[in-house]
Amino acid sequence: MRLAIRHISRYQFDDQATHALQRLRLRPQSGPGQTVRAWQVTIEGVEPALSYTDGLGNRIDLVRHDRGAKNEIVVVAAGVVETQDRAGILGNPEGYAPPWIFERETELTKAGDTVRELTQALPIEPHSLDALHWLMTEVHGRIAYAPNLADAPVDAETALQSGEGTSRDHAHAFIAAARALKVPARYISGYVLADSAMQRIADAKQSAAGDEPEEALALQSGDGMQQALGASHAAQSQGLPQAALGAQPQAAALMQQPAGHAWAEAYVEGLGWVGFDPFMNRCPDERYVRIAVGLDYRDAQPVTGLGASAVGVEISVVQSPELV
């Protein structure tokens, strides 16, 4: 599938700020399941002061904005990515960080009593692929979609206790539980082509939480063991049926998640890294584009910095028949 993506972020200088510094994680990289055909990050009137690859393999741009006569900063990331459905399996691509790095707890993924209660309810062997599918389904059912939560992330324990959150919180809860089971797990930020299944889940989660659905933003080869595990996993990884993409000249409305979409990946012996989207209760397929990876949201946040505050984000993901 060929996806055309456009991500526009707007910021205003803070009072008294003479300049702003930003770290951008807005460049997808080619790898298992995705090939970047064209991509550009444009910052009005500014060139990145430094671009590099961090210790987790993310492409980073560092930018300084001098206030001058302007009060707004506009950052545009756009391009075309070709994707393949690998049933969520990335395998063991060459990378910067070994799997054991992602067993480490963070403030946002620390296992408390609620996370441990979830892992203790696991009915099967904890290091199996089936256990991770069970965990994904449990997190999906325990956290209702709440698009109007504050932008500041909450930790996994709080998300499970409150029973509401966004895809970011679903990912943190899954990661915390997986790490409590001694399974390496990491946070992924990226984009997803929304479909009717995604909208139905958002509506159902809102209804279950007692909220009225709100108007969404219109944005948005291995050895024998690996092959056998992969075949079993592929049968489990299918989510709700996808709407006919050919009938969607524009992307379906993506729920109000200002930073795009988030999911998790866990390391499975014999398969390598495997993606799990507990928000959608499915494994990532050709509708997903990975942008950044981290121990949690803070490592993979699209834009961080000082001296300016976000005032608006627009994200569109559209199936494209040609390069744009």
Region locations from a protein language model:
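A short, charged
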Residues: 71, 302-324
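Generic structural hydrophobic/aromatic packing signal, biased to beta-strands
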Residues: 24-26, 41-43, 77, 119, ...
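Residue-level preference for alpha-helix termini and adjacent loops
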Residues: 12, 16, 23-25, 101, ...
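Hydrophobic/aromatic-rich core segments of domains that either
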Residues: 137, 169-312
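Secondary-structure boundary elements
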Residues: 81-85, 90-165, 181, 206-210, ...
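Short capping/connector residues at structural and topological boundaries
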Residues: 18, 22, 31, 105-107, ...
